[in-house]
Curated annotation (Swiss-Prot):
Family indicated by similarity: Belongs to the ERGIC family.
Any GO BP annotation: endoplasmic reticulum to Golgi vesicle-mediated transport
Glycosylated residues (UniProt): N266
Protein name, UniProt field: Endoplasmic reticulum-Golgi intermediate compartment protein 3
Transmembrane segments: 26-46, 342-362
Coiled-coil regions, chain positions: none
Biological function: Possible role in transport between endoplasmic reticulum and Golgi. Positively regulates trafficking of the secretory proteins alpha1-antitrypsin/SERPINA1 and HP/haptoglobin.
Native species: Bos taurus
Amino acid sequence: MEALGKLKQFDAYPKTLEDFRVKTCGGATVTIVSGLLMLLLFLSELQYYLTTEVHPELYVDKSRGDKLKININVLFPHMPCAYLSIDAMDVAGEQQLDVEHNLFKKRLDKDGFPVSSEAERHELGKVEVKVFDPDSLDPDRCESCYGAEMEDIKCCNSCEDVREAYRRRGWAFKNPDTIEQCRREGFSQKMQEQKNEGCQVYGFLEVNKVAGNFHFAPGKSFQQSHVHVHDLQSFGLDNINMTHYIRHLSFGEDYPGIVNPLDHTNVTAPQASMMFQYFVKVVPTVYMKVDGEVLRTNQFSVTRHEKVANGLMGDQGLPGVFVLYELSPMMVKLTEKHRSFTHFLTGVCAIIGGMFTVAGLIDSLIYHSARAIQKKIDLGKTT
């Protein structure tokens, strides 16, 4: 018993008799308020614990032979779909001209609304649907190229064949109405119908995972002496307005928390025949979810440059929107992990202990202040 008596001396929490305890309205108010605050802080801590945290790691990218998926949704309010070409090429030498096999073009009116609910989809290398029945023509015919014949081009049986022959010669294709093939296919009518329209380009590209570029530019694209050029001879440079709105642009799949810096970018061309260049640095990214799902995607940063393209070729540039991308040799690995349960318990204990301590100090201050004031009032009454 004597040992127990000595042990009691170490009690840091001495108890008072129930008869000596005083309950006040101020103490009740402090208890209720502190209890509510404690509950709110606990719920906040619980919500934080239930979320996952992401741990970033940096590695050398050792992947080889992969494809790079580029998601695109861009609006050109003053560039008709019939005038616009989309091309992609990489430093490996692979060039995909007029790439549309995974892209759609949707015609827009002058107010930005779709002309029709259906979008145009053109397969790469696929002949477009004509306004006449091609079966009505002799399949063995050999029509004129109107003076643009070459050794490898003897016959021009379509408007596109004539345009190609003219481009090979370097001639301007200015008056398609004088060419029977174009008049038969309604080429001028198609161009005139879309003259004051805009165009929405959306879909995705799949390119080699090496540095390269893709661009949106007016005129038909083609190769001339191993150089990529666009036929702008039938366009007036003063009529080319490359104002654009990038609704979405990303490289790969989205993951939680991703930021695509070009999303919702609206750029107004200050004058005609502008060349916009976006220099993009792509960082390969692997995102691992807590359930084991692995997303292989990319992040990117970007800078923009713009200038007036006064020429059709050469150093003066080409009117259009160009996205030039490079791939980083480093890869970012983002791993989702559950938060530590011990940290959660520590936080809850800190909340409870801290609130009890602060509430006790406030209650003591209120109680002793009220007693001091009451004593002064009582002394005033006796005198």
